[in-house]
Amino acid sequence: MKPIRFLLAVAFGALLALPAASARAQNVQINGAGATFPYPIYSKWFSDYNKLHPEVLINYQSIGSGGGIRQLSAQTVFFGATDGPMTSEQIFAAPGPIIHLPTVLGGVVPVYNIPDVNVELKFTGKVLADIIMGRITKWNDPAITGLNSGVKLPATDITVCHRSDGSGTTYIFVDYLSKASPDFKKTVGVATAVNWPVGVGGKGNEGVAGLVKQTPGSIGYVELIYAKQNKISYGSVQNLDGEFVTASLESVTAAAQVAAKSMPKDFRVSITNAPGKGVYPISSFTWILLYESPSDKQRSKIMVDFMKWALTDGQKFAPDLGYAPLPAEVVALELEAVKRIKV
């Protein structure tokens, strides 16, 4: 009888241990922070991945690209997200090698609130730059009316709305303006946070969209999905080939196809003001940032699996949320790149 009692005791002990093991399996939380630009699709991805893997909860704070880079560098989050690639100085200062993984593409659009003007305005890069620098101050300035014949624009003062936080959306916007206007590059420059000559600041894409929506005579810049969600007017922008192009899945994808032909190994590439017919000039990849050799191998393995899913099955969610999916050539390169992450 002793062997039977012993076996029963072992079995009973194993059963008692199951809930504890199960609880541990249910408590894998991975924290990330960064860009607001991709928040709508990241939120969708993390939710759907949790449905596939209930034991995993990915928590993401959309605090802006600058904040995401800082928190990743300080190792207070497991992954970061940015719309502007890290600088070489930031990468060098980080405690370990970091890999940039493009996730989707989007377009940054000039949004405006002009009472009684409900048409799509045309902008050149130079005109946008002069507005942002405070050199064009009225909506009926000849530089604007000359691009928009037949549109009656008022003599209303222009209020510039910009980001108050470190922002990849800002990086994309000023990167384009710096290519279109050498004077803007010299005066304002390219960074996730710049010294704005004029205007008022809002936090996140949501904050800028809210400012523009509530401020008659205003202009700002947000990711396309935020303009659509908030029902704010946005304009077309002249590309390098001289066309005035409206942001859309097709025009952003056209920009990506140009980049796909010469993608650098580290994936840090700018596609603003790309050449080509039908290309929207203020387009960009957005990136998730991961350490190549993290100390937490369990979370690393989960994030590698998540990235493989996001780069393949997850891409189908992009169009409905206003993003362009990655070109197949870029996905193939990334699936090879994630193998560098140690799990």
Regions found by a protein language model. Give the residues of each.
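Flexible loop/hinge segments at secondary-structure junctions
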Residues: 24-343
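Positively charged n-region of N-terminal signal peptides that target proteins for export
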Residues: 1-5
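Bacterial N-terminal signal peptides
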Residues: 7-19
